[in-house]
Amino acid sequence: MAASSRKKTRDYQCGLGPAFDAVGGKWKAAILWQLMHKPARFGELKRGVAGITEKMLIQQLRELESDQLLTRTVFHEVPPRVEYALTEWGKALNKALAPLADWGEVYARGTGRYPG
């Protein structure tokens, strides 16, 4: 059973469960953040998400697409081009993540975990 199939059958105690499932792990929030303002190609995402491997980026993009947070559009041209863009669900999630990112910066500075 695929990970996204398991998510659909889980019993959640509150809305944080499905939200954390959607952005769980090290990379998904960073990928969504990269797509906030405009669609991006695979290479742009790879460069924009520091430290992610090609294999992991492919896996995370597939999961985000399966969870209906982004779309993958293949342009039939030479050379082939593929773009990733946020769906309405993905855009709404990014709006929800913005205050969390603000809190994270304040928290990290206040606890000495942020160099900036």
Question: Where would I find each of the regions flagged by the language model?
Answer:
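N-terminal intrinsically disordered/low-complexity leader segments
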Residues: 1-11
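Basic amphipathic alpha-helical segments that dock to polyanions
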Residues: 57, 61-65
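Amphipathic alpha-helical dimerization/coiled-coil segments
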Residues: 2-4, 33, 88-116
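N-terminal helix-turn-helix DNA-binding core of bacterial DNA-binding proteins
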Residues: 10-56, 76-77, 83, 91, ...
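Beta-hairpin "wing" of winged helix-turn-helix
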Residues: 65-85
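Generic structural signal for secondary-structure transition and capping sites
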Residues: 28, 40, 66-69, 102-105, ...
